[in-house]
């Protein structure tokens, strides 16, 4: 193919902690610069000419549209018999807020009533629901809406009648990105989190009464440890106690309580200043806290404590001790506790009594299968609720449940659009330092992977996010066509507890890259694929992962998909919300931590003349998490360094009216992934 569009190179360098750091494409950082916008247009045109010419792109797009058009339930919140869901209806571009009943779900008759559709009255499909929170009695819902993938929500309030009729109130509160909402028991208002105008940090808890001007809402909590402190808020069922979890970095939650009957006493620390993760809910009576903590238990334990008593962790009562499973979300369901327990990257839901007796598990005799729990909610009084799970072969499953004294109800499965049977297995292999790493292998059941099998290796490895089973139209489509899809459970995630996370963050980040390299090497060494048939794929922190892989091991694979990536690890904290991530990666302003990130920063390890794998970088102009400048700068540098050697192109696509991924309409997702699939089949020599 012809050479990429030319890119102006400048002599720009900084001296940081005694090290000279070159940055020849810094001018590409300013996305509002007309020259940069023209450069992006030229790059997009070059990429479109290459990918639109691929003979299989239209077929990929058609199948992805069909798979992405399947109904999907993303989350469910129970209030009495009402179940509020964020779900995408068949063929829809965006998620809607819908209403079901527990009885209807249990009887498999669960066609939802749509309460709010962001597409109605919208100019295009880029208007999305970001989050929602129903009131305790289920008659009102606060929800956040944003445009263009920005996730910069404006809070709105719906009143939901007995017949599911909806009235939209006049209340509008901007700057409520990823908002935490705690309704007053009587529904007169709520506590919520909001950002100062024009500020990406200093998230603060306010109180709002319906009908009031939010500009006058009083501050409830603003005791930030740092500007990046991330509070969430909850209220006890009687409204007496305010509970704030303040995330400080990615391995610490400080927890505080306030007694509204004695406000002069001020906030009391439940736990603070300790590098542990503790998340609490109010118990069934509303007089105590119950939750999970990694204090003295890296895999987690369930503890309880009274609200009006001592909060010394030494006095906490352990209900579920640390075991070989990683404990995650906890839900109070009447007289029971539901706890998500993860073993070898597969979730189960355990039922416990408050005295620490294991009562059983949710699901069929085999549990919920090879699946992930994406949502779990119950009515605090009746104990009835619903769990939402996903799997490699299931867009969603709804599992209604009742207290253990009542009979179990069946599950409600999402449709699968004729996907052939898939074989899912888990394997292990040693990393560079001998650590055992796990990996999912997914392929069509009648396929035996071999040297000619086109294979995609995906990973993430960061922010205590576990690589558990997912529903992915891309995986389903790839496997349908005879491909192998591998997902590596790298250090930096939470697959095996907080110690696993710590082993892949800050000074230990290179472990993540070593794990990923070892996964690729294992796939080749065991004959499941070959270098020529291997592609690697990652997005966001996973984009950093594959960026490090292509610069550290250019021999690793034939093709790379690098989506919405972090790649300049020296300047990353200067843009958007990225200072939130210095606790995970390190802060380049600190000499020792600069050394950590400079050692692997992909943008700073591109070597001229190296035959890098074919690389497709894709990003979006509305991304408010990872600035698209990373992909722009890396594309320019790779194109210049390798000259898009031979048949190994370096392509860049920057999507308009889209963001990091949340709120991206199906039409844009199908375009994005059809591009990736067509790029891979081209570079793996199978189209």
Stretch-by-stretch model annotation:
Residues 88-95, 121-126, 145-154, 173-177, ...:
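A flexible loop/linker signature enriched in serine peptidases of the S9 family
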Residues 34, 38-133, 144, 229-282, ...:
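Non-catalytic accessory segments flanking enzyme active sites
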Residues 490-687:
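Active-site-proximal cap/loop segments of hydrolase catalytic domains
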